[in-house]
């Protein structure tokens, strides 16, 4: 009989992040499809009662908690000790956790300590004929595979954005506190602050309703024989600021640089979605470049509506892949779009 443990950490305000609720949904779905299994929840943070109460109506039979100021910040030593203590208290065989940066660096080490196995970047969890299986992407996101393991414990990191969040109702949860004895050495690392881009400078927004993909044409020579990189930067950032869209890039920075092209300064390797299909993870799936010039990229089929801008009305990829094709200059189209967005926002 499997005992499924959902591990989650609280946010600074004591709440549970969306990624934690997504992991809980995946675990609850697995519990439902696995006869005789038990579902328990383990929470870590400065104060976890509010978080536990917010999911009190979920099908978990027991709640475990590790609390204290030492567990409010992300730190490998304390997080690993807390996860191990909760695991032992719950007598779990399967552990499901959101693959946040905090858990992603901790769970493999905890699995090693406990003689188990860990799988990361999992996008689906299920069971058939009493066997648990997980789904994840391989070979630069071009192939999806399903795998099972007999080794226990099994630690599963669920990719944020791959599952719907659990809609568990609130109530009053009874939490069994687990004591963790920490040494001074385990508390040497201290988080002194967080450096992050301003909201307007953030270009990767997984929850956005729109994915805007910059093709390589933005930095190529235009109709006048010149490049207009500063203008392209202004148009793209202006659109992102007003639409709150997520930004993707169809070609890698290495490819662009190798071809002697200028690189838009706000793009990073995290924005690339073309051949690697890695990030950003969009709510509707992954996408390829704006007119689908890379047909081997998986995920293009998941986008609900695909719109492309191309000066070539006979562009085969645009005609074959796009739902709506604008035969026009992208600079002019986006300038008009920004103008309309500004007028609508005013």
Task: Name the predicted role of every residue range.
Residues 1-346:
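N-terminal glycine-rich FAD/FM-binding segment characteristic of electron-transfer flavoproteins
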């Amino acid at each position: 009989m499997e005992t499924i443990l959902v591990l989650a950490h609280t946010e600074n305000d004591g709440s549970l992040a969306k990624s934690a609720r997504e992991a809980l949904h995946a675990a609850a779905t697995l519990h439902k499809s696995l006869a005789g299994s038990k579902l328990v929840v383990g929470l870590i943070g400065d104060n976890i009662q509010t978080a536990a109460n917010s999911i009190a109506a979920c099908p978990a039979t027991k709640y475990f908690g590790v609390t204290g100021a030492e567990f409010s910040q992300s730190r490998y030593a304390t997080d690993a000790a807390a996860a191990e203590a909760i695991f032992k208290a719950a007598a779990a065989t399967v552990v499901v956790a959101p693959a946040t940066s905090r858990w992603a660096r901790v769970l493999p080490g905890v699995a090693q300590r406990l003689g188990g196995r860990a799988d990361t970047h999992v996008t689906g969890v299920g069971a058939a004929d009493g066997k648990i299986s997980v789904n994840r992407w391989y070979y630069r996101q071009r192939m999806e595979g399903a795998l099972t393991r007999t080794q226990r414990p099994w630690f599963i990191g669920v990719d944020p954005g791959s599952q719907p969040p659990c809609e568990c109702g609130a109530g009053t949860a009874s939490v069994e506190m687990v004591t963790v004895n920490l040494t001074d050495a385990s508390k040497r690392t201290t988080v002194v602050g967080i450096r992050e881009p301003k909201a307007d400078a953030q270009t990767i927004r997984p929850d956005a309703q729109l994915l805007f993909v910059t093709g390589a044409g933005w930095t190529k020579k235009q109709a006048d024989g010149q490049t207009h990189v500063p203008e392209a930067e202004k148009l793209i950032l202006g659109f992102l600021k007003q639409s709150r869209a997520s930004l993707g890039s169809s070609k890698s920075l290495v490819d662009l640089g190798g071809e002697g092209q200028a690189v838009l300064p706000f793009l990073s390797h995290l924005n690339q979605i073309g051949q690697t299909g890695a990030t950003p993870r969009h709510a509707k799936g992954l996408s390829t470049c704006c007119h689908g010039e890379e047909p081997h990229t998986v995920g293009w089929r998941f986008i609900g509506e695909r719109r492309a801008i191309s000066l070539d009305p006979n562009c085969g990829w645009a005609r074959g892949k796009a739902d709506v094709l604008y035969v026009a200059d992208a600079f002019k189209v986006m300038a008009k779009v920004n103008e309309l967005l500004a007028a609508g926002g005013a």
